[in-house]
Amino acid sequence: ANRGGPLHVYGPPGVNDIAEGSWLVTRPDRDIRVADHEIDPEHMRIIPHLYSEGVVFDRNGLKIIAIEVDHGEFIRPAYAFRVEYCGHVFVHSHDTRYNENLIAQAQEADVFIHEVAAATPATFEANPRAKIAIDHHATPQDVGRVFAQTRPKLAMLTHLVLLPPHPMPIG
């Protein structure tokens, strides 16, 4: 409520639809807040900014770079991010397979967070579709190669997916 204007949101293709959809679905709540709290409705608006590979944001010493990565044939575009601030570099792979473009941008990062996914042979036998999901991500071996090639000061894993051989029922 203390924001002095609209919220600026940066995103890939589709961000305009998300901003417009959010504006539409929050109308009842927004109307109440405008009436009850005397909030300027324009301060509740989302202003979308579409980005592609390259510099997304560069202001007051903070630089954010989108790095196109490979998250599968049908999931395009997909981006990793490099954040530079006060002489430090943070890189986050987001969802990706092994990717040379990411490796080039992640050299000697202070912090490099990379996703990883794996499954046992029993998982693939019990659920052949599991291979489709796993093929969209970096394997533990891939991530080991990435960290060896980029030599970050701190390497971390995220999106730790280890699919079980048999799906667990819900409920």
Q: Model-derived features: where do they sit?
A:
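Cap/insert and terminal regions of metallo-dependent hydrolase folds
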Residues: 9, 80, 89, 97-171
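Binuclear metal-dependent hydrolase catalytic cores
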Residues: 1-91, 169-171
